């Protein structure tokens, strides 16, 4: 059951204040008030701590958030088409594999973070619907005494074709969500979907709410990846699974050289021709190179509290699927 609105506001605002104040020195707390250590830190250290990267550019943390928002606001309407063009359609196979690796059953509660255009959510719904229909057929086969009319009526009376499954699509960008909602209507996905405007670093959901958390090609755009991972861990139920599909680092020198050539010389040109936006796709290419390699990202997932963390390289490591469990 969803929390009352007042509780949600407290969760969002209250938790944000709690983090901002750094907790306290009361028994059981492990962090001091932020001003307790300011005297020992130089202004240059404070400045560096507030800096991050936007592609290859060094920017303030606040500036990165607004820049990333602008990128996806600009590309939202051409986002899916550009994915097809940039990957030659291979991204579809990667996402299909992510769903097969998840193997969701009817009743699964999914949170798809940074999932604005709905690619993962729609695949999830199609998969669980097929699973639910297979389960129904098995059940009907065991009821040998039913007539065909009774079987047909039983199917007609089935109101929930998803077996109670729900895909919650959460994205920080309104334009991406707008595109996803329109796609859902166009593709006939009318049930089992929820659309939420939210920040990966401060999710507007209760603890232990979801069975699976997915994020596909989104986590490298987050300013504080460690906070996003901690939030993923928080909102998953005990036993829940974290799955991340993201670009990786290619180890083969020859393939890496060809990949760099294609990424830096071809993708921005495609972005300019198809979407009329060179700079946004230049950033997206640079953001891939700034993202941690597969082993380092695995360590970050473990640091967030996940266990049994593994990853699988796809297409020679151009992308990888990382998996972890909240145990």
From Swiss-Prot:
Q: Which reaction does it catalyse?
A: 2-methoxy-6-(all-trans-decaprenyl)benzene-1,4-diol + S-adenosyl-L-methionine = 5-methoxy-2-methyl-3-(all-trans-decaprenyl)benzene-1,4-diol + S-adenosyl-L-homocysteine + H(+)
- Gene Ontology MF: a single term: 2-methoxy-6-polyprenyl-1,4-benzoquinol methyltransferase activity
Under the heading InterPro entries, the entry gives: SAM-dependent_MTases_sf, UbiE/COQ5_MeTrFase, UbiE/COQ5_MeTrFase_CS
- Write down the PROSITE patterns for this protein, in alphabetical order: SAM_MT_UBIE (PS51608), UBIE_1 (PS01183), UBIE_2 (PS01184)
Q: How does it sit in the membrane?
A: Peripheral membrane protein
Which pathway does the record list? Cofactor biosynthesis; ubiquinone biosynthesis
At the top of the EC hierarchy, this enzyme's class is transferase
Q: Does the keyword Isomerase apply?
A: no
Give the EC number(s) under which this enzyme is classified: 2.1.1.201
Q: Where in the cell is it found?
A: Mitochondrion inner membrane
Q: Where is the transit peptide?
A: 1-49
Q: Tell me any Pfam family this protein matches.
A: Ubie_methyltran
Main location as per UniProt: mitochondrion
Q: Where does S-adenosyl-L-methionine bind?
A: 117, 171, 199-200
What are the UniProt keywords, alphabetically? Membrane, Methyltransferase, Mitochondrion, Mitochondrion inner membrane, S-adenosyl-L-methionine, Transferase, Transit peptide, Ubiquinone biosynthesis
Q: Which GO terms describe its cellular component?
A: extrinsic component of mitochondrial inner membrane; mitochondrial inner membrane; mitochondrial matrix; mitochondrion; ubiquinone biosynthesis complex
Q: Per the UniProt entry, what are the Gene Ontology biological process annotations, in alphabetical order? A: methylation; ubiquinone biosynthetic process
Say yes or no: keyword S-adenosyl-L-methionine present: yes
How is the quaternary structure described? Component of a multi-subunit COQ enzyme complex, composed of at least COQ3, COQ4, COQ5, COQ6, COQ7 and COQ9. Interacts with PYURF; the interaction is direct, stabilizes COQ5 protein and associates PYURF with COQ enzyme complex.
State what this protein does. Answer: Methyltransferase required for the conversion of 2-decaprenyl-6-methoxy-1,4-benzoquinol (DDMQH2) to 2-decaprenyl-3-methyl-6-methoxy-1,4-benzoquinol (DMQH2).
Record-stated family? Belongs to the class I-like SAM-binding methyltransferase superfamily. MenG/UbiE family.
PANTHER family assigned to the protein according to its UniProt record, in alphabetical order: 2-METHOXY-6-POLYPRENYL-1,4-BENZOQUINOL METHYLASE, MITOCHONDRIAL, METHYLTRANSFERASE
Name by which UniProt lists this protein:
2-methoxy-6-polyprenyl-1,4-benzoquinol methylase, mitochondrial
